[in-house]
Amino acid sequence: MTLDNLTHHFLIAAPSMPDERFAQSLVYICRHDRHGVLGLVVNRPIFDTQVGHLLDNLDIEVTDTSVMYDTPLDGGPVYPEVGFVLHTGQPTWASSFPISENVCITTSKDILQNIAAGSAGIGHYHLCLGHASWHEGQLEKEISQGDWLVSPGDLSLLFEIPFEERWRHAAEKIGVHLDFLSDEVGRA
């Protein structure tokens, strides 16, 4: 696998991850280009609030009651006050761009209004507060040091597997049993 473009891939934190902010995290890479990497942690629910409460704070009326109790995610340590909507569907919103054929990231209020109303066109979604980012070459270095494992993107893992199972499930999907992973990284 080449590390040139990890867009629509997962980063699986190694058990020996030195940065506690990412311990046992699963990060979905939304953008990887010559400027760096932007990703969203997709297995850290924020249980002390609900999407409905956050939308209410933005003066967005929630008419779809199922949205009221959806759980937002801690998307990462950078700009935790900024919301990112990771969703299936097409990039038809004011500030939206595609990640893969059927996954987009959107930061505009119009998608939040549609989520609140239960409108069609969104499918699965996660409201992530904050994001993770790496400057040019930083992530590649962390991968070579053994801090991260890499796995191809998978809609089921992204939207259907329970949050608490995602980290292990992602590793097992690439044949890695995290309990047996060595803390040492070497080269032959």
From Swiss-Prot:
Pfam families: DUF179 (PF02622). Disulfide bonds: none annotated. Gene3D superfamilies: VC0467-like (3.40.1740.10). It comes from the Bacteria. One of its GO terms (cellular component) is cytosol. InterPro entries: AlgH-like. Belongs to the UPF0301 (AlgH) family. PANTHER family: UNCHARACTERIZED PROTEIN YQGE, UPF0301 PROTEIN YQGE. This is UPF0301 protein PsycPRwf_0144. The lineage of its organism: Bacteria, Pseudomonadati, Pseudomonadota, Gammaproteobacteria, Moraxellales.
